[in-house]
Curated annotation (Swiss-Prot):
The gene is MT-CYB. One of its GO terms (cellular component) is mitochondrial inner membrane. Belongs to the cytochrome b family. Heme b b566 binds at H97, H196. This is Cytochrome b. One of its GO terms (biological process) is mitochondrial electron transport, ubiquinol to cytochrome c. It comes from Stenella attenuata. The lineage of its organism: Eukaryota, Metazoa, Chordata, Craniata, Vertebrata. Keywords: Electron transport, Heme, Iron, Membrane, Metal-binding, Mitochondrion, Mitochondrion inner membrane, Respiratory chain, Transmembrane, Transmembrane helix, Transport, Ubiquinone. The cytochrome bc1 complex contains 11 subunits: 3 respiratory subunits (MT-CYB, CYC1 and UQCRFS1), 2 core proteins (UQCRC1 and UQCRC2) and 6 low-molecular weight proteins (UQCRH/QCR6, UQCRB/QCR7, UQCRQ/QCR8, UQCR10/QCR9, UQCR11/QCR10 and a cleavage product of UQCRFS1). This cytochrome bc1 complex then forms a dimer. Pfam families: Cytochrom_B_C, Cytochrome_B. The chain crosses the membrane at residues 33-53, 77-98, 113-133, 178-198, 226-246, 288-308, 320-340, 347-367.
């Protein structure tokens, strides 16, 4: 008798995706992050669902409803901080996953890569609208500053901003619609993630060498399920340590002050995972220029497959490209640091130089290094 998992219409889909999936035998722990992102998404949806049961999306009660969750709801504080720090873990996994894709040339699976960029943008949008919901000072001013950027669009900008606000300032209507967006977007992310997997399973996984591995495949289960479980345990352990020992480590103290339109915080800054993009935005003195640079800092990922000049897919055997890749990582860390600093000397110039280097590395230096390495292959 044939196994039910191979014949049942639903089980067959799961079997082909998680059990009998042929997987390269040499993929490293850098390939763990896909499943960890799935785990993060499930955790965020579940904790978010329980928070939504007690939260009220109204300017007069939003802040106190979050306080009520933390004080009066059974384990409400735990659910709230799991959700807040879960977002940080989500972005750590997301950036590691993208970094892996860049290093090993996974971006050559173009459909999978483009869906991935779309996923990144959707997750960033979800995190942004979610940060507005507690209705603290940083929530309010973050929403005001970031939505205001759209006013830089010529002709329709101001109308667009007022349309998003649902009025002439960030107010009740804005909070209500942001809650609606924050509730629906994770389900859109889930659907996109399914399409992401669908496209990935059309080609099969890449591997560290970047060489086709069709002649050496092993089943996903038990080899990689056990490896994914180890990764999941490490992720959960880190998240629990963060949540139970230092829940506010990555948050902003200003968000414990209720939103006040009449008092601007000294330093308006987003959560840590947006600081690199915020630094690029601030490094250009022109509003429209800054907005375009901000958009391009993420959308540049779409152009990476077109900028592949090397004959080798992976950076595993390309020392010049490796050096530039790690320079890019250092540059992104520098931008993250700058994004959290006040706008004054020497941070302004450091931010501008780091922003120039970011685009220079991706658009010019890395493709050039690929060409040089091609020449070296002939020696």
């Amino acid at each position: 008798m044939t196994n039910i998992r191979k014949t049942h219409p639903l089980m067959k889909i799961l079997n082909d995706a998680f059990i009998d999936l042929p997987t390269p035998s040499n993929i490293s722990s850098w390939w763990n992050f896909g499943s960890l992102l799935g785990l993060c998404l499930i955790m965020q949806i579940l904790t978010g669902l329980f928070l939504a049961m007690h939260y009220t999306p109204d300017t007069s009660t939003a802040f106190s409803s979050v306080a009520h969750i933390c004080r009066d709801v059974n384990y409400g504080w735990f659910i709230r901080y799991l959700h807040a720090n879960g977002a940080s873990m989500f972005f750590i996994c997301l950036y590691a996953h993208i970094g892996r894709g860049l290093y090993y040339g996974s971006y050559m699976f173009q459909e999978t890569w483009n869906i991935g960029v779309l996923l990144l943008l959707t997750v960033m949008a979800t995190a942004f609208v979610g940060y507005v919901l507690p209705w603290g000072q940083m929530s309010f001013w973050g929403a005001t500053v970031i939505t205001n950027l759209l006013s830089a669009i010529p002709y329709i900008g101001t109308t667009l901003v007022e349309w998003i606000w649902g009025g002439f300032s960030v107010d009740k209507a804005t909070l209500t619609r942001f809650f609606a967006f924050h509730f629906i977007l994770p389900f859109i992310i889930t659907a996109l993630a399914a399409v992401h997997l669908l496209f990935l399973h059309e080609t099969g996984s890449n591997n560290p060498t970047g060489i086709p591995s069709n002649m050496d495949m092993i089943p996903f289960h038990p080899y990689y399920t056990i490896k994914d479980i180890l990764g999941a345990l490490l992720l959960i352990l880190t998240l629990l340590a963060l949540t139970l020992f230092t829940p506010d480590l990555l948050g902003d103290p200003d968000n414990y002050t209720p939103a006040n339109p009449l008092s601007t915080p000294a330093h308006i800054k987003p959560e840590w995972y947006f600081l690199f993009a915020y630094a690029i935005l601030r490094s250009i003195p022109n509003k429209l220029g800054g907005v375009l640079a901000l958009l391009l800092s993420i959308l540049v990922l779409i152009f990476i497959p077109m900028l592949q000049t090397s004959k080798q897919r992976s950076m595993m055997f390309r020392p010049f490209s490796q050096l530039l890749f790690w320079t890019l990582i250092a540059d992104l860390l520098t931008l993250t640091w700058i994004g959290g600093q006040p706008v004054e000397h020497p941070y302004i110039i450091v931010g501008q130089l780091a922003s120039i280097l970011y685009f220079l590395l991706i658009l010019v230096l890395m493709p050039t290094a690929g060409l040089i390495e091609n020449k070296l292959l002939k020696w």
